[in-house]
């Protein structure tokens, strides 16, 4: 019942459709048994009688109160209408190959106890409030609903919880507001586009026999759909359209949506020189690294300009064959493009500035977990982009796997329902319906700023790749597909029937397209010279990082520290936390004592002062997993928040920090994408514990480590991985440094394990300084846990106001007499502090040993270590000491590199845990025994 009172009017005044139907059904129930309804409802019926149509609908044949003989018919009509809305998609014409049984009794009238004659007596508006004006009665309204809900477009939005959205969606469908009739000019243009799409595929099929191209045929309408989407969003003066897709149909999208010249694509098939393949101005600008990638993984940018004031860049993201993983990266692109980071405070987001389109596969959409991870980002504060357009390029098969083996749902799109995303299924053979679906989607996003999904249902004309014979595993299906006309042929026949074009004109389009493609091919084929490949990175990458100034004057540090502690007078943080943070006011007294947390926030404050925006995200990153950070303060009385880094006076760029969802894969992808697009921004992703970084392994393997070598895609992403063996077990000990080192080559990233607050400060500032430079690269830092509050890690003021990041550090109390040193211990991270602690606590003669901490594991500090080793003339041995197992940690990476630089005759050996399948002990006492053994053995002098 409505809570709104209309007294003295009847309480159901204004009800219509399903709501009025529910009241009528209740009244029918009341007539049969008054006690079957609740007391309040019974009182309403006793006072007001049955619902009257005249107050709820404006219809000439609805002037009387519903008689008892019509109540059952009205209830049936309303239930039937709702059933059509909910289930019409099950009998819709959305399958090009597998035709739906339109004679199904699913929507038969007798199932709802209503006849055609009775329906004629039911007012139109009772059934369909937004029906077109030409409908005369309930029967026509029902037939109208059947038509709009069971045609080549089918709709699912009953799972959308917001009533305003649901009503808007229903109105769009039932009024057919989205379904504008295309003028003949646009119909001809659509046929021309389909001719280009099909002609391109056929030409490659005939010319490059058996070569992989992952044809779009069967889903040809995807290209005109993208055309329509770009045209629609450009009406909002959108700056960027970001597209993510896999390899199916990618070459066609590159050629037609991105404008990559045909001859450039042909040259990739021929592996010909590319001097003829420079793209036209503003079209199809593609990028490759020095090792490159296959042609159907490459991305491109295209600039579209109607006039000087309206310019849009369309980007297709580079993508490996790991299906769906590009989705969060594209979302990161879009968010970065939408935000203004040029002034202090939080970034200012304008969702009209960028639009993301994600093209999925029907097997991968329900099959890959990164899909739902990405969908979950869609309405989160730190990640939303104002709605993305999802298109499932649904060819009803995954390689050789059929639907019943690839998903447990009715539709490939069903996972989207859990996120309340409206779904339109559309038959890929109906070109005009496909274009209309795009208009529907763009209008929804414009109004509600949420995701929309189009399930584009077609088929795959050939095998998974063109060297594959699909009839081996799907003989019946491919017997049907071979007889099935192409999308272009179907649409050409339609336009001939509508007398928009003649058969001769349609044929001429086809012939002209072939001749043009042949002309472009001959331009490439005429050059027979052999192409030379350069597989080495450019010199500026080989040469390493430039020297940059990272020290900051004491006066600036003190001023920034004061501003960070200058909270609004009315703001009341947690009292215990307030005391802890206020202690920082004295951090620069005397020689100074700056701990890790203060060094971090001062690094960011100084980076903002320099005009570099900062974005940090991760699980619990606002506070910090180990409660050391507190970038977001909470008022203990009002729960309002205060972000000190957004209020410092001298900041010249924005700062953002977000607690991420419990997701690694999509979040790393998002931050990588954000960073790639926003090259001027220091973007950091932090793992809750370093152990969980392998939840994003694909992102590191395919993008972060190799993106530049494959695609020329620069990134300065910073990854913070809490790492260290402290008895917390195999899930809370290791950031898997060995995995990052195993992929370390060609200066593709920096891997560091810092042991002082100043080192952390300098390496963050160095990273910010190299952004937008050719030498930029990702930075992987193994960050501390227990050391966060260890005073040994704190640094004096001079360490921040002087110097720079050092790739190696030496134990300050050792090595003063080089002639006495017999053993040098090389180590990294927390264990170095434990070794130092052991030395300090044991009053012995330690002149025979020296400890060198390797702070930068990659690039390997060859020169620094080699030059230092030369200074110990009586050196007898070098030990690499680590707390990780021998097959993990840095040993495997470091051993051959250290051996290359050892003084002649000096042996290298290992001290640490033995080979293990699990990274750490699960029993605290066992951990302590191992840790003690490693430290003791390292610092025990041999006889």
From Swiss-Prot:
Gene: odhA
Superkingdom, taxonomy of origin: Bacteria
The entry's keywords: Glycolysis, Oxidoreductase, Thiamine pyrophosphate
A single MF term (Gene Ontology): oxoglutarate dehydrogenase (succinyl-transferring) activity
Family the entry assigns: Belongs to the alpha-ketoglutarate dehydrogenase family.
Enzyme's top EC category: oxidoreductase
Entries under InterPro entries matching the protein: 2oxoglutarate_DH_E1, 2oxoglutarate_DH_E1_bac, DH_E1, KGD_C_sf, ODO-1/KGD_C, THDP-binding, Transketolase-like_Pyr-bd
PANTHER family referenced in this protein's UniProt entry, alphabetically: 2-OXOADIPATE DEHYDROGENASE COMPLEX COMPONENT E1, 2-OXOGLUTARATE DEHYDROGENASE
Entry-linked SMART domains: Transket_pyr
Catalytic activity: N(6)-[(R)-lipoyl]-L-lysyl-[protein] + 2-oxoglutarate + H(+) = N(6)-[(R)-S(8)-succinyldihydrolipoyl]-L-lysyl-[protein] + CO2
Cofactor(s), names only, from the UniProt record: thiamine diphosphate
Classification via NCBIfam families: 2oxo_dh_E1, PRK09404.1, PRK12270.1
Function: E1 component of the 2-oxoglutarate dehydrogenase (OGDH) complex which catalyzes the decarboxylation of 2-oxoglutarate, the first step in the conversion of 2-oxoglutarate to succinyl-CoA and CO(2).
Protein name as catalogued: 2-oxoglutarate dehydrogenase E1 component
GO cellular component, one term: oxoglutarate dehydrogenase complex
EC number: 1.2.4.2
Subunit comment: Homodimer. Part of the 2-oxoglutarate dehydrogenase (OGDH) complex composed of E1 (2-oxoglutarate dehydrogenase), E2 (dihydrolipoamide succinyltransferase) and E3 (dihydrolipoamide dehydrogenase); the complex contains multiple copies of the three enzymatic components (E1, E2 and E3).
Single GO biological process annotation from the record: glycolytic process
């Amino acid at each position: 019942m409505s809570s709104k009172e209309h007294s003295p009017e009847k309480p159901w005044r204004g009800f219509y459709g399903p709501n009025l139907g529910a009241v009528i059904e209740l009244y029918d129930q009341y007539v049969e048994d008054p006690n079957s309804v609740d007391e309040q409802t019974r009182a309403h019926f006793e006072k007001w009688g049955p619902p009257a149509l005249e107050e709820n609908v404006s219809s000439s044949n609805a002037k009387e109160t519903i008689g008892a003989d019509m109540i059952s018919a009205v209830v049936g009509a309303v239930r039937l209408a709702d059933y059509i809305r909910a289930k019409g998609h099950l009998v819709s014409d959305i399958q090009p190959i597998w035709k739906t049984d339109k004679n199904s009794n699913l929507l038969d009238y007798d199932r709802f106890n209503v006849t055609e004659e009775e329906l004629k007596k039911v007012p139109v508006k009772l059934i369909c409030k937004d029906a077109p004006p030409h409908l005369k009665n309930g029967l026509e309204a029902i037939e109208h609903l059947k038509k709009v809900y069971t045609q080549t477009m089918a709709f699912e939005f009953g799972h959308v919880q917001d009533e305003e959205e649901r009503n808007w969606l229903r109105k769009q469908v039932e009024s057919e507001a989205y379904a504008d009739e295309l003028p003949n000019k646009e119909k001809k243009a659509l046929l021309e586009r389909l001719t280009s799409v099909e002609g391109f595929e056929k030409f490659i099929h005939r010319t490059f026999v058996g070569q992989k191209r992952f044809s779009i045929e069967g889903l040809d309408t995807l290209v005109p759909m993208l055309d329509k989407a770009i045209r629609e969003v450009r009406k909002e003066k959108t700056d960027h359209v970001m597209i993510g897709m896999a390899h199916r149909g990618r070459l066609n999208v590159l050629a037609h949506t991105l404008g990559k010249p045909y001859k450039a694509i042909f040259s990739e098939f021929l592996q010909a020189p590319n001097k003829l393949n420079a793209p036209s101005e503003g079209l199809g600008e593609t990028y490759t690294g020095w090792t490159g990638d296959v042609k159907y993984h490459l991305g491109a940018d295209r600039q579209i300009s109607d006039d000087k004031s309206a310019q849009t860049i369309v980007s297709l993201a580079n993508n490996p064959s790991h299906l769906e993983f590009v989705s969060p990266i594209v979302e990161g692109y879009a968010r970065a493009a939408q935000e203004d980071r040029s002034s202090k405070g939080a970034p200012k987001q304008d969702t009209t500035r960028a639009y993301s389109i994600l093209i999925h596969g029907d097997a991968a959409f329900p099959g890959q977990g990164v899909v739902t991870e990405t969908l979950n980002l869609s309405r989160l504060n730190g990640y939303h982009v104002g709605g993305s357009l999802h298109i499932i390029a649904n060819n009803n098969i995954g390689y050789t796997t059929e639907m019943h083996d690839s998903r447990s749902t009715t539709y490939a799109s069903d996972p989207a329902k859990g996120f309340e995303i409206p779904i339109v299924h559309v038959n890929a053979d109906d070109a005009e319906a496909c274009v209309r679906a795009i208009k529907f989607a763009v209008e929804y996003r414009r109004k509600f700023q949420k995701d929309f999904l189009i399930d584009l249902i077609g088929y795959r004309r050939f095998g998974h790749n063109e060297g594959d014979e699909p009839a081996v595993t799907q003989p019946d299906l491919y017997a049907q597909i071979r007889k099935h006309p192409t999308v272009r042929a179907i649409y050409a026949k339609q336009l001939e029937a509508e007398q928009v074009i003649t058969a001769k004109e349609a044929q001429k389009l086809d012939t002209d397209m072939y001749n043009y493609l042949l002309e472009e091919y001959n331009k490439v084929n005429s050059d027979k010279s052999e192409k030379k490949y350069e597989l080495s990175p450019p010199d500026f990458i080989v040469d390493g990082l430039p020297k940059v100034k990272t020290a900051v004057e004491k006066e600036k540090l003190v001023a920034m520290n004061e501003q960070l502690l200058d909270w609004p007078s009315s703001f009341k943080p947690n009292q215990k936390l307030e005391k802890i943070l206020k202690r920082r006011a004295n951090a620069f007294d005397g020689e100074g004592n700056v701990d890790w947390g203060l060094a971090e926030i001062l690094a960011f404050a100084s980076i903002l002062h320099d005009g570099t925006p900062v974005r940090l995200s991760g699980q619990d990153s606002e506070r910090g997993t180990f409660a050391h950070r507190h970038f977001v303060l909470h008022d203990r009385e009002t729960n309002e928040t205060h972000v000190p880094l957004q209020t410092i006076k001298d900041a010249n760029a924005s700062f953002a920090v977000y607690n991420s969802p419990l997701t690694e894969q999509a979040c790393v992808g998002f931050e990588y994408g954000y960073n790639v697009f926003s090259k001027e921004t220091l973007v950091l992703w932090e793992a809750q514990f370093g152990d969980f970084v392998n939840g994003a392994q694909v992102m590191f393997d395919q993008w972060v480590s190799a993106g530049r070598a494959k695609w020329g895609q620069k990134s300065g992403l910073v990854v913070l991985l809490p790492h260290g063996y402290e008895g917390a077990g195999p899930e809370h000990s290791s950031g898997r440094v060995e995995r990052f080192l195993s992929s370390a080559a060609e200066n593709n990233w920096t891997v560091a394990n810092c042991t002082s607050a100043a080192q952390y400060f300098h390496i963050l500032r160095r990273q910010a300084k190299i952004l937008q430079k050719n030498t930029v690269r990702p930075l992987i830092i193994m960050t501390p846990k227990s050391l966060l509050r260890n005073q040994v890690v704190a640094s004096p003021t001079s360490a921040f106001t002087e110097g720079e990041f050092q790739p190696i550090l030496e134990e300050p109390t050792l090595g003063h007499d080089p002639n006495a040193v017999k053993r040098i211990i090389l180590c990294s991270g927390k264990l170095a502090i434990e070794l130092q602690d052991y030395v300090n606590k044991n009053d012995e003669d330690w002149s025979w040993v020296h400890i060198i901490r390797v702070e930068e594991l990659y690039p390997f500090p060859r020169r620094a270590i080699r030059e230092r080793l030369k200074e110990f003339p009586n050196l007898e041995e070098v030990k690499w000491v680590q707390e990780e197992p021998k097959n993990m940690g840095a040993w495997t990476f470091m051993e051959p590199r250290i051996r290359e630089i050892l003084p002649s005759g000096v042996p290298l050996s290992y001290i640490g845990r033995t080979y293990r399948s699990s990274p750490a002990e699960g029993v605290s006492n066992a951990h302590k025994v191992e840790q003690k053994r490693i430290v003791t053995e390292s610092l025990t002098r041999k006889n």
